[in-house]
């Protein structure tokens, strides 16, 4: 499994930009996944940017190098190409426009390079992109930690297993909120805090299949058990789950090693066991 971070994407875009032709007057995004690469390329070259709908309507944004009335060649960009469905849909929508249109994708499934005019790197599946891991296929099949992933971790003084902790459960700042239903939430929060946890999840519209909490009756009992990562790994062994997203580097490595499956660590932004 391959993991591409924002940082790696930006590095790849800088390299790709050097190879792309210089006679491109504007860059067009295939929403939403094409928004990042297309806008980065447009900003780098200081040329006009638009979306597929915008191109049809003749609406462009930004860019001082090319006036809107002198746009002759447009690069339509997506972050990746697998089946080519999005590219085909864009071609159909843009067919007939009185302008030269070329197509590109940063990452392309090997063998499908012919579907675009320009591509940067062949990339087989499975692969995960940082910018959409919480918004599609992988989230649907993932186990997610709560503290450190969905919301911030409690600081020391908040973690008193009492009134301060209950305030934290109500007011925890969100971090990564998925836009699709996730397979399971697997947390070391105690089972007795389920009502507060479910209330917070409803507040931020987090949709999930299961909420699996720690069975210990107290913080001290959970510490004595010392099975923070072990229990997560045992749950993750279920073949229904294809990815675990964990905040703690130490736990992420243990979960991956025990379950023999990939774990994405949000603290380090690395994929272990991929």
Locate the predicted segments by residue.
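PRPP-associated nucleotide enzymes
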Residues: 1-143, 149-172, 192-195, 199, ...
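Short active-site oxyanion
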Residues: 23-27, 182-185, 240-243
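Conserved beta-strand scaffold positions in the cores of enzyme catalytic domains, especially
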Residues: 49-51, 101-103, 211, 244, ...
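Residue-level recognition of beta-strand->loop/alpha-helix junctions
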Residues: 53, 105, 187, 212-215
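Acidic beta-strand-to-loop metal/phosphate-binding motif
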Residues: 74-78, 184-188, 242-248
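Acidic, Mg2+-coordinating phosphoryl-transfer loop and its flanking beta/alpha structural elements
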Residues: 104-106, 239-274
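Substrate-recognition element of Asp-dependent hydrolases with the DxDx(T/V) motif
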Residues: 176-198, 212
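Substrate-recognition "cap/lid" segment bordering the active-site pocket of phosphatases
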Residues: 194-241
């Amino acid at each position: 499994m391959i993991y591409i971070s924002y940082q790696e994407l930006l590095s790849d875009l800088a390299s790709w930009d050097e190879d792309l032709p210089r006679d491109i007057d504007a860059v067009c995004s295939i929403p939403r996944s094409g928004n990042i690469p297309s806008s980065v390329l447009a900003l780098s070259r200081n040329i006009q940017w638009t979306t597929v709908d915008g191109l049809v309507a003749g609406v462009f944004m930004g860019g001082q190098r090319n006036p809107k009335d002198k746009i002759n060649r447009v690069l339509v960009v997506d972050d990746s190409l697998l089946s080519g469905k999005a590219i085909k849909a864009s071609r159909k929508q843009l067919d007939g426009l009185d302008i030269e249109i070329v197509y590109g994708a940063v990452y392309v499934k090997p063998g499908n390079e012919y579907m675009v005019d320009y591509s940067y790197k062949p990339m087989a599946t499975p692969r995960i992109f940082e910018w959409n891991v919480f918004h599609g296929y992988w989230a649907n099949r993932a186990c997610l930690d709560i503290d450190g992933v969905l919301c911030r971790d409690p600081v020391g003084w908040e973690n008193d297993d009492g009134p301060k902790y209950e305030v934290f459960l109500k007011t925890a700042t969100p971090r990564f909120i998925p836009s699709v239903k996730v397979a399971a939430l697997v947390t070391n929060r105690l089972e007795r805090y389920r009502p507060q946890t479910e209330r917070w999840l409803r507040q931020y519209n987090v949709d999930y299949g299961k909420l699996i909490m720690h069975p210990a009756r107290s913080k001290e009992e959970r510490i004595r058990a010392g099975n923070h990562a072990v229990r997560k790994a045992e749950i993750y062994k279920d073949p229904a789950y294809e990815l675990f997203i964990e905040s703690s580097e130490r736990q992420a490595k243990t979960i991956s090693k025990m379950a023999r499956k990939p774990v994405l660590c949000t603290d380090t932004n690395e994929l272990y066991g991929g």
